[in-house]
Amino acid sequence: SQVMEQFVRVGVILVAALSYHYFGGSIYQTGTVAMSGALAGGVLAVLVLWYYNRKILSGSTEYLHQWKIMPQTTGLFKRLMIEGGLVSLYSAFLILFQLIDSFKVKNALMLFGLSDLAAKVDKGVYDRGQPLVQLGLVIALALSSTFLPGLTKYFMKKDRQQFLQVAKIFLRLTTTLASAASIGLMMLLPYMNFTLFKDYKGNDVLGVYVLSIAFMAIIQAYQSIEQSRNRFKGPLVAAGVGLLVKLLTTGFFTIRWGTLGASWSTILGLLATLFVLVRQSDAAINCFVRERNFLKKLLLSLAIMMLSLLVYQGIISILFQGVHHRSQAFFVTVLGVAVGGTVFISTIIKLELFTIREWLSLPYGAKILRMRQKK
């Protein structure tokens, strides 16, 4: 449902841009059509969830009365507002960061020395990173929705050992996938930037910004773990600290370093939130980075993937003498994803970063293991 929502939303935005280019119209009409993509994507996501819900409950009459409001369930409204509100807050966390940017960055860029028009252009380039990050976070959100029921079940059963084990698996998987997505996207960003916008503007700024995928994914993982234990105050305080840091540093950093400073203020705000969440969490959970040398193996795997993509970039530069067409850039991006993904997966299998149970927790994890065993 999340992938379809993102696909439709981005598709509507592209249709709006193409319509403006070929058929004209005002920028306000174009913006209205582009904004409708969020509504269309949300409706499709609900329909997908409804379809699979009916499919799961096929042969059962439960779905006929599952939406009936019973007198004894009215007390759930408060829980829905608190727990659902916290989930919504963290789901929209980067959007709140973007809201701060919308009030701070453009004016700070003018104090940085840019003209009004140049500041608007630079802000537009900086905003390119937001949809890329949101798309990269789909995996993290999917993992959260997968592991949260299990964490809650073990917590309710007071099975501390199983709870800790599942929580650490969740954090290891999230950290690995989100880190790989961040580094891979950072390395392939020039080609992706050219594919989408036909220029290489802001590669350094966006390269820093996409690192927020990793930090935001880990933040959401910790928030899900805390929520499964009915702890809501800590994550709320952590979110407030992160937003405050972002608010206080955006203007100052942007005046000194331009949009690169705005990107670093986003990373700093996320780090502040993550720091508070880690401090509030149990040491028995935080030790996941040390077990079986997880952090060392992960950093080595990421370094090998980066090296392979640097070699790949060199080969592309020699073969094409630079990428000058969108079709070329798209092909190079897709091939780069395949190269980086293959190298990374092969490396983490070789280093035994995951246990068999952890592999089986991933989509297609069993297939990857079988393919590796055949070799």
Residue ranges and their predicted role:
Residues 1, 211-241:
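Membrane-interface junctions at transmembrane-helix termini in multi-pass inner-membrane proteins
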Residues 7-48, 233, 243-275, 289-290, ...:
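Membrane-interface helix-loop junctions in multi-pass transport and translocation proteins
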Residues 86, 93, 118-140, 171-173:
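Alpha-helical transmembrane segments of polytopic membrane transporters and translocases
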Residues 1-92, 96:
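Hydrophobic transmembrane helix module of multi-pass membrane transport proteins
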Residues 129, 137-158:
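Helix-loop junctions and terminal segments of transmembrane helices
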Residues 313-375:
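Membrane-proximal transmembrane or re-entrant/amphipathic helices at the cytosolic face
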Residues 164-215:
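Alpha-helical transmembrane segments of multi-pass membrane transport and lipid-handling proteins
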Residues 15-21, 40-69, 270-318, 342-359:
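C-terminal transmembrane helix end/exit motif
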